Amino acid sequence: MAVSSAHSVNSGALAPSAVVGVIGAGAMGAGIAQVAAAAGHTVLLYDLNEAACDKALAGIRAQFARLAERGRLEPAQADAAGSRLRAVRALADFAGAALIVEAAAERLDVKREIFATLERHVDDACLLATNTSSISITSIAAGLRAPQRVAGLHFFNPAPLMALVEVVSGLATAPEVAQVLVATAAAWGKQPVMAKSTPGFIVNRVARPYYAEALRVLNEQGGAPASIDAVMREAGGFRMGPFELMDLIGHDVNFAVTESVFRAYFNDPRYTPSLIQQELVNAGFLGRKSGRGFYSYADGATPPAPDLEAPRDAPADVALFAQDGPAAALHTRFTERIAGARQAGTHADDLLATAGRASIALTDGRTATARAAQTGVADLVLVDLARDYTQAGLVALTRALQCSDAAYADAVGLFQQAGFRVVGVADVPGMVAMRTVAMLANEAADTVNQGVCSPADLDLAMEKGVNYPCGPLAWADAIGIGRVFRVLSNLAASYGEDRYRVSPRIAALHAAGRTFRS
């Protein structure tokens, strides 16, 4: 299709002289309008509620003034950006726009009606974008005279601060339209990624296991929310644990997204919603906004602490076994901090260490109880994954049912001697961080395998869209594809559920001895 002459020949981005329209004056629409105005565009903002539209414009101008006060903008720049904002009272007023971004209600019928109306008023070269986070771009564009000019332009909230933009192509979207939107998002200071229209796009799909596995562990009495959150923050390196994050998002919103993805994938068990979260929604315990979710947010409420193990004596005899992959850093930390520890080569049962009566290994997706029975190592204690064992201040341990109290105390004492605080969790397959990261990598691998996006764009999306400490594919490479394959295979064997089936991409890389980056 012909793309507006308002875009730059060199970059493909819309020139600052191009007029940008935004439909919807809520938080997201106002944020997108602010981003476009800051980039030099005249921005037309429309909302059915005229008072809300005027209030949003005043709020954006006030935000520009605050940025000037903080030295982030020159006063003249702030005034100029504010002057480029205008309210319009009808969709027909977008006639001269080069790009219109719709950020209205998340309803297919509403979006279709908006775009059908716009087609009657705008130039044939005007690009039509939707900020939807969940509705098929193909479905939104269906029935339009020119569906090839419709694409997703999905910002993350708050739009002025969050770097990521997902540029989403439906079946009819013209490649040059997506390229112009990618270039324009980059010109606006964002980091765009390209995706094809599938349920959840990239971020809302790949992030599902972060919530789902935590809820599964909680449902199996694996640990309290505060303990699971602490493991994911302090060992996993995530900014927020899954339960505090769900409380922040709102359980009504988070549960609805999970349900939507579950239905969209024809009830694939990977995306099965949690009964625990459904009960919170039924009770009205929606998180921060209602004052109660997994945690209480009442005045004076104190956040619960993780269930830390009490201090134990350091074990008398410690032997360390050589490691590769993520456990190599743990071996280094033990070597540096455990005086008198013996270097004992490698171990046939893949042990990390023996400490007093305890035998210690990194979880491989089996329960400690099953692994102890299979290897004949009764006093077995497993340690969970950490993003970087040299820096982590906390780790999770679990024990086999066969493990004696004395042996477990020796293991706890070893980790405490090495400077870790220790959270004890129940013996669930894959523990907490390892199963979560493996399932994130598995979902990411399937997303790439199905042609939704490139590996590089996927990792960038998860780092910039939801602040993951590392993209899940790069993380899988660091852990080792073979280890991730074993963890997933053992989870599948433990549960006997299709939910934990190994992605064909991971299986192929494992068979070939390859990585996502090789």
Q: Residue spans of the language-model regions?
A:
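NAD(P)-dependent Rossmann-like dehydrogenase/reductase catalytic/cofactor-binding core
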Residues: A2-H7, A15, H41, K190-S197, ...
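Phosphate-coordination loops involved in phosphoryl transfer and adenosine-cofactor binding
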Residues: P16-V19, A97, A125, P315
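Glycine-rich Rossmann-fold phosphate-binding loop(s) that bind the pyrophosphate
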Residues: A25-G26
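N-terminal Rossmann-fold NAD(P) dinucleotide-binding loop
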Residues: G29-A30
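Aromatic pocket-lining residues of Rossmann-like dinucleotide-binding sites
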Residues: A36
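Conserved beta-strand positions in the Rossmann-like core of class I SAM-dependent methyltransferases
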Residues: L44
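Rossmann-like NAD(P)-binding element
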Residues: L48, A52, R66-L128, I135, ...
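Rossmann-fold NAD(P)-binding glycine/threonine-rich loop
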Residues: E113-L164, S169-A183, T354-Y408
